[in-house]
């Protein structure tokens, strides 16, 4: 359908998952194939003119694969990490996506829409040449503990 209308997509790819998958694949051959399939799909998309941009669910960095993923969401938001660690997460995730695209990575969408308070993560994004945010949506609200956001003023 996209080709029919010459339409292009911007896809926000969870780079933290890709990093976790790549790391876990060193101990599980099945995961090598999964990573390779995703990498091929991303290369095909970018070769076709689609755009991939940065999406981060940092809880993947605490999750492990042991006959299935053991998901640890105790550090769900970038805000749950120190400023130095946030900077390395953003840098590593951007580098992961850069491996799959010749186009610049400059936009971000927060995992779980957990962007606030923005000043706490702004410098880490800017240090990595991430200058556009795609997280906020009109009227968005979550009051869930640890996963809160309030975009009602947007």
Predicted feature descriptions by range:
Residues 38-43, 87-95, 122:
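Generic structural signal for well-ordered alpha-helices
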Residues 72-86:
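Glycine-rich phosphate-binding "P-loop"
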Residues 60-72:
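Short, flexible, mixed-charge acidic loops at enzyme active sites
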Residues 11-15, 54-58, 109-112, 134-138:
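A cross-domain feature marking catalytic cores of carbohydrate-active enzymes
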Residues 5-9, 47-52, 102-106, 128-130:
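Short, well-ordered coil/turn segments that N-cap beta-strands
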Residues 104-154:
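Active-site-adjacent pocket scaffolds in enzyme catalytic domains
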Residues 1-48, 109:
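Active-site beta->alpha N-cap acidic-glycine motif
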Residues 3-4, 82-113:
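CE4/NodB-like, metal-dependent polysaccharide N-deacetylase domain
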């Amino acid at each position: 359908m996209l080709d029919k209308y010459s339409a292009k997509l911007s896809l926000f790819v969870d780079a933290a998952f890709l990093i976790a998958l790549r790391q876990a694949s060193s101990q599980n051959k099945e995961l090598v194939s999964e990573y390779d399939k995703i990498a091929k799909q991303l290369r095909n998309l970018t070769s076709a003119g689609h755009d991939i941009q940065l999406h981060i669910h940092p809880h993947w960095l605490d999750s492990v694969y042991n006959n299935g993923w053991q998901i640890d969401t105790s550090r769900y938001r970038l805000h749950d990490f120190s400023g130095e660690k946030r900077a390395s997460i953003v840098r590593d995730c951007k580098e992961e996506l850069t491996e799959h695209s010749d186009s610049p990575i400059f936009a971000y969408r927060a995992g779980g829409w957990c962007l606030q308070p923005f000043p706490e993560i702004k410098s880490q994004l800017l240090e990595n040449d991430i200058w556009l945010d795609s997280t906020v949506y009109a009227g968005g609200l979550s009051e869930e503990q640890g996963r809160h956001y309030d975009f009602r003023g947007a």
